[in-house]
């Protein structure tokens, strides 16, 4: 029985490989594809669209987490909290533009004191250096 209908997997077939691993991504391409189909965004979804979207989402997540990790390290902490996410997003010009209308719970506000509220700087008299 060397025909094609012997049942089971063929002996020469390769092991199954996920689309995420084929694309070198950590985000799930199959899940993104399913969500695109079920979300009624379009009647049909191409094969490359979920791969591209998963790559974009992975990049954004990595960018935000890197900046938040830097903010946590600046505050001498080892755990990222919502405050670090808020500081990372609001201090980055492009991320702030992208997520400008997003409210982060427990994020707080950026430290900012208006220039008029700061004490006036008075010039201090030098010790004889200006008398020439």
Curated annotation (Swiss-Prot):
GO molecular function: DNA binding; protein heterodimerization activity; structural constituent of chromatin
Chief localization: nucleus
Modified how: Phosphorylated to form H2AS128ph (gamma-H2A) in response to DNA double-strand breaks (DSBs) generated by exogenous genotoxic agents and by stalled replication forks. Phosphorylation is dependent on the DNA damage checkpoint kinases mec1/ATR and tel1/ATM, spreads on either side of a detected DSB site and may mark the surrounding chromatin for recruitment of proteins required for DNA damage signaling and repair. Gamma-H2A is removed from the DNA prior to the strand invasion-primer extension step of the repair process and subsequently dephosphorylated.
Motif ([ST]-Q motif): 129-130
Modified sites of kind N5-methylglutamine: 106
Region (Disordered) location: 1-24
Biological processes, Gene Ontology terms: DNA repair; heterochromatin formation
Biased composition (Gly residues): 1-10
GO CC, alphabetical: nucleosome; nucleus
InterPro entries, per the entry: Histone-fold, Histone_H2A, Histone_H2A/H2B/H3, Histone_H2A_C, Histone_H2A_CS
Keywords: Acetylation, Chromosome, DNA damage, DNA repair, DNA-binding, Methylation, Nucleosome core, Nucleus, Phosphoprotein
Subcellular location: Nucleus; Chromosome
Domain of life: Eukaryota
Protein's job: Core component of nucleosome which plays a central role in DNA double strand break (DSB) repair. Nucleosomes wrap and compact DNA into chromatin, limiting DNA accessibility to the cellular machineries which require DNA as a template. Histones thereby play a central role in transcription regulation, DNA repair, DNA replication and chromosomal stability. DNA accessibility is regulated via a complex set of post-translational modifications of histones, also called histone code, and nucleosome remodeling.
UniProt note: domains: The [ST]-Q motif constitutes a recognition sequence for kinases from the PI3/PI4-kinase family.
Family listed: Belongs to the histone H2A family.
Protein name: Histone H2A
